[in-house]
Amino acid sequence: RFFPHADKYEIIRNFKKPDNFSYNTYFTYPKGGAIEYVNSLYRRVDPKKVSLREELISIDKRKKTAITNKREIKYERLISSIPLPILMNKAKIKYDKNIYSWNKVLVFNLGFNKKGNDKINNWVYFPEKKYSFYRIGYYDNIFNDNRLSLYVELGFANNRNIDSNKYLELVIKDLKKAGIIDNHKLISHVSIIMDPAYVHINKESESDKIRVKNELQKHNIFSIGRYGDWKYCSI
């Protein structure tokens, strides 16, 4: 549903005169990382109304009250971007859990002692099963740094228990196998598990999502965003 239709005429025409009007035409990235998008939004709101380290426990739709681990908050309209299945659980909306599925992604951020072999690409996909990862990206090529820094992504089923240390050794081995590194020394690393990462879209979930969102909106609850709207989209 995300890939554009491949028209034979357009393919032949692009051989003669290439053009690109996709979201990849221009690529920008803040110097401080993607967190700068959040910081920019934060500077435009009242900081007294921003609450951190506060967990939503449940939502009382009838009383229009959100219960957290610290307090109860009365609301007129509630806008949520948390994953839709989690919101349904919090708001006590019945749904078939079998039709909502997703995967986990283990992400490694790796820093090495010297520049890598690939000095051109920003990111590369690896569809071959012989590699543990499906995509890597080069921070150093984006920022024109003189030492290799990568993000490496590995996909898993949502019910898998993931040992990050175990997979770090495998990733280093596969990076060497792919020719990304050779005698490089790893000097810094950190990992994070995205759960959910990519949602699985099917006819049943798309249909049920309409029902759920209509029910939520009756109580002035609006579920938005990549995970709130349970869809695949880019930044």
Roles of regions detected by a PLM:
Residues 25-28, 159-160, 231:
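Active-site rim elements
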Residues 1-62:
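Active-site/ligand-binding neighborhood in enzyme catalytic cores
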